Amino acid sequence: MGHSRRPVGGEKKSRGFGRSKVADVGDGRQAGKPQVKKATFETTKKKDIGVSDLTLLSKISNEAINDNLKLRFEHDEIYTYIGHVLVSVNPFRDLGIYTDNVLDSYRGKNRLEVPPHVFAVAESSYYNMKSYKDNQCVIISGESGAGKTEAAKRIMQYIASVSGGSDSSIQQTKDMVLATNPLLESFGNAKTLRNNNSSRFGKYLELEFNANGEPVGANITNYLLEKSRVVGQIANERNFHIFYQFTKAAPQKYRDMFGVQQPQSYLYTSRSKCFDVPGVDDNAEFRDTLNAMGVIGMSEAEQDNVFRMLAAILWIGNVQFAEDDSGNAAISDQSVVDFVAYLLEVDPAQVNKALTIRIMETARGGRRGSVYEVPLNTVQALAVRDALSKAIYFNLFDWIVERVNQSLTAREPVANSIGILDIYGFEIFEKNSFEQLCINYVNEKLQQIFIQLTLKAEQDEYAREQIQWTPIKYFDNKVVCSLIEDKRPPGVFAALNDACATAHADSGAADNTFVGRLNFLGQNPNFENRQGQFIVKHYAGDVSYSVEGMTDKNKDQLLKDLLNLVGSSGNQFVHTLFPNQVNQDDKRRPPTASDKIKASANDLVATLMKAQPSYIRTIKPNDNKAPREYNVGNVLHQIKYLGLQENVRIRRAGFAYRQTFNKFVERFYLLSPKTSYAGDYTWTGDAESGARQILKDTSIPAEEYQMGITKVFVKTPETLFALEAMRDRYWHNMAIRIQRAWRNYLRYRIECAIRIQRFWRRTTGGLELLKVRDQGHQVLQGRKERRRMSLLGSRRFLGDYLGIGNKGGPGEMIRNGAGISGSDDILFSCRGEVLISKFGRSSKPSPRILVLTNRHVYIVAQILVNNQLQISAERTVPIGAIKAVSTSNLKDDWFSLIIGGQEPDPLINCVFKTEFFTHLQTALRGQLNLKVSENIEYNKKPGKLATVKAIKDPAASPNVDTYKSHTIHTSPGEPPSSVSKPTPKAKQVAARPVTKGKLLRPGGPGGGPSKLASRPASRPTPKPQPLPQSQPATAQPIPAPQPAAVPRPVPQPVAAAAASHTRNASSGSVRAPPPPPPASPPAPKKATAKALYDFTSAQSNELDIRAGDVVQIVSKEGNGWWLCMNMATSVQGWTPQAYLEEQVAPTPKPAPPPPPPAAPRASPVPSANGAAATAAAAKAKPAPPAPPAKRPNMAGRKAVPAPPPAPRDSAVSMNSQDSSGGSGRGTPNSTSNASLAGGLAEALRARQHAMQGKHDDDDEW
């Protein structure tokens, strides 16, 4: 039911309609797995036109709905929602919104994430079927030409694309399902005045899926083919498409076998004088039909028989009659009858007799009576001819549908299904007959389903579930359905059957009887009886039906003469089309057409009521099939009879989602920690309380849901989408947990491997460098004094100190500037000096860079030119050109490369000279000529040998050589026979724990227990419970939960480390209890000092002290100043070291036993001599020393903020015997006053102890 079936031309285009979101309509379909694209912010998102959901309208009225649809239609937005009911307006043109890119954008998305679209309805149906295991159906309604067939095809397209399945049988099923569209459209669709591709039959396609949501089969049920179209059409309409396809594009084989000619040659295809459809290529459509037959699996013989029947129908229509002398019908052209007999493979005489003579029998007393042959007049003969044609085509169409179902039979068990109903729309013509009555009756039944499932059922359910609800008034069309189908009181169909039974011989008499029966319906407010016609007030409007010919159309029975004719055929396919044998003795009235359509409609309703429905309401914007025309009046009429306004009101006042407590809990129990544990259902209460708990734990507001008697009602779809998103996220979180644990384990393994590798490299990686260092001793052969630093055990011959061989960094810049080839291996690089001779001045060392490769020696200069650094190779010497290397026997770093060329030999000063000699000997493969003597020889000019003398100078700097006037002054070095010291042992440090991966305790191996282990258990593990009203799954017995363990105290690292190296003597399953934790170590003691003299600060960074004050030592400097802090005020500052006496805390001794009580003694009497002695002592007190001249510089030292005052430690306090707890600045009493000599002795002993510790550290180094 689209606008057109195929554009003229070879390229096949989409038949869809709607706004395109992708510019390229011709993108090919991407096979394979769907590509998940990275989410991006849509900066170019188009602004919404109107409202995309009619429930968001500020004013609810038919006019407001019409205005919104018109606004969106004018901007190519043809889809609009009413909740999850989709309203579609046919634009009669292809806007390219059904491309693969657009389809992928709706994959896995809910309704609110994407704009309204038929793909969204298909996605929702497929998701609900797969997630909730409920059968789904999509009911597409609307009048003829509104786009129902197009919507059905797009739903099939989407489901076939997203349903997955890489198996060949599943793909074959998809292909066959899609192939049913062109096949059934060719045989079941036709051009009408309102629609170029109108479905003239009803189709319910049921897609069958397995448990994985993959299509495994399908089944098609067809309803009431309009077979009268085979023999006649009104002007500007066509017969079924297949007749024009066959007559225009039949291959020569069929033209020769079946005498196929152009459509103008046949009465059945030329009566309406309409042979073509604008924009439709019948030749290309016929190729699609043949291809679809092949995909379905029709053999060539089956296809030949199908087209044989089509040719027979066309030729039967060309049989003409004329009156003979008796006024009876006679065949005008016997050759046509002969060819029809050839096609049906019957005797031509039997064809002649069946079309012109009717056999009648008389009954006598229940026995068979006489048989009479009654000639037919021309009118009766034409009716018999047309009846034969209609019967052949009707049965042929049923056979095609059955053949398709046979190919689509499921090959594996079916779990669920999705049904798609594509049935003819409501029709109102100038002359409406029995066909329109049946079509409109079926649409009334569909409207009744919509009312029952969306309006009435929704309100009834709210009342039944005791939900707070405001009732909405609506029109229930059940009265119209009863008017047509009821038997008591008799309806239209009952009156029609009665008329056919009582006046079956004469069609005119039967029609008059039918009119008389209709008078009994005159009291019905939805019915009006008029002269020769009657009016039924349908939901879509009042329709006037003509009574003429209705009884004949309702009989729908083939004369026994015609049944005998086809029964005598020699073609087995004809017998397949007419399988029932003629029962001559059967006197029962066969079912009429109205009986069949009523039974089919009721079966369809029963099928739809078993599934979860989705609705698409199609609207036809105009009757002219014009692309941009919007007829406001026509659309407003459709809005009214479709009941969109009532649907919007109920949707806004109702609930978007409702589900029984059991299914709700089964779906969402994972979202609450109280109803699930590790994926198991653990709730022990009933389903209703479980649902309440889930909604509570997911923080759903109370106004967003209501609890009914058996169901939970969720008000807005956003809430449901939020629950679904949280449920999906639960599984993502579980997967992330597993992934995180695995990645932690991998990180732990990698970290352990890295540590082993690091240790191995540290142990063995330096061996090669040590070999090179030892080789340097062999190069010198004990002929040259050594520097002390060269003999350190930690010395390694690394070679490329400047990183010339590295990629990036300054080394690469030097390499590029010097032009060093990338193929050269860098053996050595270092900064040094080269002796430069200048005219008129003495030679002077100048900085250079020395680079040794496996082929050259480069002397690289760095020069500033216009404040720009320029790097260039000042001298490039091939190593093969070096004849000798000359150096002195002292420890200096000078040597010369004797080349003997036209340029002077370079005299170089390099601190890593021995390493250079070693690498140069390696590059020369041991052919290095190293000259060691008292003088260094080199060619200052070509052929002019010059010498540089090296002398020992005790006054020279120990680490720097001095060159002056061809003399090198150097200090005495180590003996030439010296060798390198052994490699020092690494300083003992605490083992660093492996913390990556979070698999070990925070302290690492032997460390404290993990945080998880020390944290008390929150609750015991709950037992899994069976889901409500479900069979309990067989599971392994789960042990009873153990009581939560009491957390153990965290042991100290020392004790834990010791425990980690202790082997457990018992291998039994019961472990011995852990030893009690050791006592906590005492707090670290703070270094303090006692002020010996008063000191007044002269600068802001110095600290004032008074004699007897006790201050805390923050740091000690070697320049005679200590950084101290006043323990009372927390003020820091510098104090002269000579003014302080460092205090050493006494070692605590065990408390002695209490002394015996002493006898009381008299208080001493103060004498005058005591005061005099004190005054004398004050006069004899030595003067304080002068502070160091070099005061501390605070500019380069970062200020240390004063720490907060800490509680005094009595073990460190110098006034520990003072129970009053002074500030430390008070004068010590006479019993604790130490002499100055004693304090200095204690300070010396402390210093000696500290120095001893430093020496130990050096040894460890």
Curated annotation (Swiss-Prot):
PROSITE patterns: MYOSIN_MOTOR, SH3, TH1. Residues 1084-1145 form the SH3 domain. Gene3D superfamilies: 1.10.10.820, 1.20.5.4820, 1.20.58.530, Kinesin motor domain, Myosin VI head, motor domain, U50 subdomain, SH3 Domains. One of its GO terms (molecular function) is Arp2/3 complex binding. Residues 1019-1029, 1038-1052, 1072-1084, 1147-1159 have a biased composition (Pro residues). Residues 1-39, 956-1093, 1139-1261 are annotated as: Disordered. It comes from the Eukaryota. Residues 786-973 form the TH1 domain. Phosphorylation of the TEDS site (Ser-370) is required for the polarization of the actin cytoskeleton. Phosphorylation probably activates the myosin-I ATPase activity. It is found in: Cytoplasm, Cytoskeleton, Actin patch. Residues 417-499 are annotated as: Actin-binding. ATP binds at residues 142-149. GO terms for biological process: actin cortical patch assembly; actin cortical patch localization; actin filament organization; mitotic cytokinesis; receptor-mediated endocytosis. Keywords: Actin-binding, ATP-binding, Cytoplasm, Cytoskeleton, Hydrolase, Motor protein, Myosin, Nucleotide-binding, Phosphoprotein, Repeat, SH3 domain. Residues 1160-1181, 1234-1243 have a biased composition (Low complexity). This is Myosin-1. It comes from Aspergillus oryzae (strain ATCC 42149 / RIB 40) (Yellow koji mold). The lineage of its organism: Eukaryota, Fungi, Dikarya, Ascomycota, Pezizomycotina.
